[in-house]
């Protein structure tokens, strides 16, 4: 691949395939990670852990990965939408590369939160000192996980703001669409930033992915609920 040609391209088309491929791989990694975690849990039954505790942990993992999939699909849709309708520039190409790199870090961070939270939840095999250390580690990893979404939404917002600023198109409908989308992304950014701060105080264990769940549910809200109504005011 000739990077200079892609970075200097006058349209976003060369990036579409790369975007689709990267986000598809990220989602595939989530699909691979979930069965691995479930197998780990099932093996604990032989060590004397109750079936109810294992079943509860499995349900938590399934919900956690569902919310992660919702968020990654949201990023994919926003990013691809931008590249599909906007003229490419060196700035947008470089920011896109950074976003894709950050996106590739999401699966391992999600896996680590799930992996260590299941150890914390099934605490029969850990003493109090180990639990305290594990709790601190989960909080750090969770902050990194939510922090990735904060940075990615911020970079997406920067892409839209820059396009609004430099766009020479006279199509008012196009500019309004950019403006409306950028404001919706700004609410996602603020929500993720708020949850990053709140995640420092939310318990771990079965509630480890609660910030991720809140963020995913926020993205599922209709834009009219928090976007266009506020924009119109």
Model-derived features: where do they sit?
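Multi-pass alpha-helical transmembrane bundle typical of ion/small-solute transporters
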Residues: 2-233
């Amino acid at each position: 691949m000739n990077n200079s040609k892609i970075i200097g391209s006058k349209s976003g088309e060369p990036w579409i395939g790369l975007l689709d491929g990267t986000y598809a791989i990220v989602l595939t990694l989530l699909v691979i990670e979930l069965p691995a975690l479930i197998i780990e849990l099932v093996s604990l039954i032989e060590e004397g852990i109750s079936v109810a505790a294992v079943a509860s942990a499995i349900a938590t993992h399934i919900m956690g990965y569902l919310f992660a999939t919702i968020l990654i699909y949201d990023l994919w849709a926003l990013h691809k939408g931008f590249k599909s309708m906007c003229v490419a520039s060196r700035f947008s190409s470089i920011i896109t590369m950074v976003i894709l790199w950050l996106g590739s870090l999401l699966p391992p961070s999600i896996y680590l939160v799930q992996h260590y939270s299941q150890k914390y939840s099934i605490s029969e095999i850990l003493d109090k000192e180990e639990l305290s250390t594990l709790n601190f580690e989960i909080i750090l990893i969770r902050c990194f996980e939510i922090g990735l979404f904060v940075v990615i939404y911020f970079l997406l917002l920067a892409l839209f703001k820059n396009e609004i600023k430099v766009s020479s198109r006279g199509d008012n409908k196009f500019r309004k669409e950019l403006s409306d989308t950028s404001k919706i992304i700004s609410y996602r950014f603020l929500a993720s930033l708020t949850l990053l701060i709140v995640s420092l105080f939310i318990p771990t264990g079965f509630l480890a992915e609660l910030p991720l769940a809140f963020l995913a549910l926020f993205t599922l809200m209709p834009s009219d609920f928090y976007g266009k109504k506020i924009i119109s005011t």
